[in-house]
């Protein structure tokens, strides 16, 4: 409400409109069901004003300014939400591209993502010859990587699918203030090059491949629910799926045993700071499914990622629909339908 507009003004961005109803200090947050930009409903009033003003971009944060959500116009002029995976991908693509263009990139620079965040970031890092590190969910693990490399390597950006991002290493936690400023810079860069934020996203998909991510939360409240979640994880661990929505599983990662097993039964060790109750399955077509119990709520979470090839921006909607059908097939394979 205060810090983000001040930060944007500091960077010379004076054509900023704030939603009037949401500039009133009220800890009950009466304008939304939940003041969390992960939820589309939280951006309703912002979208209302963005349409009236014909704005270039909508950005939103939560009250403690750590998560950032955004929306922009697509090629048809329709407002679309940019999810957490897409946001993280755009941010890291821009940071790498900008540092290379300005001669600031060093061979020792690195980025970080969580293991459940889109694998397209790995493709970007690989093609751009930048070190990328995977860590567990939760920004403390990204901060850990920063601390471990302090004085030896430079962290230049990192994030997670749950709308948290950090550029540079000053804050050591997800930070919507710097993220919103970075987003504004990316939009200015796009405009200078005759593009929009949506065009930038499509360019990334065209170069590195299309990816669709979807998170499923299965709630199981109470003691019986907790036991059911434990049993689900035990069943997945002892009987991992061989097929996910028609895609053949070629690699299983178990972070509880820190082992990865391929289709031929070969086992390699996973290098992580400690064990965690997470399972991941990777398929021959790039499909990835991660499953873990929530650490704070009575639910088990499934993170699904499917791949395709996007040649033209006009294919995006059709590919998204195709991917969602694939995700439905994967849900059926997992017994979630």
What are these regions (language model features)?
Residues 1-12:
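Active-site pocket-lining segments that scaffold enzyme catalytic pockets across diverse folds
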Residues 15-18, 78-96, 178-182:
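Gly/Ser/Thr-rich active-site loops/lids in small-molecule metabolic enzymes
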Residues 51, 55-57, 61, 78-80, ...:
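Phosphate-binding and adjacent anionic-ligand microenvironments
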Residues 11-12, 75, 128:
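Short, structured coil segments at secondary-structure junctions
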Residues 10-67:
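N-terminal small/polar loop signature for handling phosphorylated ligands or for N-terminal nucleophile
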Residues 70-73, 168:
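Short beta-strand-to-turn element immediately C-terminal to the catalytic PLP-Schiff-base lysine
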Residues 1-3, 65-69, 142, 165:
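Short glycine/serine/threonine-rich phosphate/pyrophosphate-binding segments
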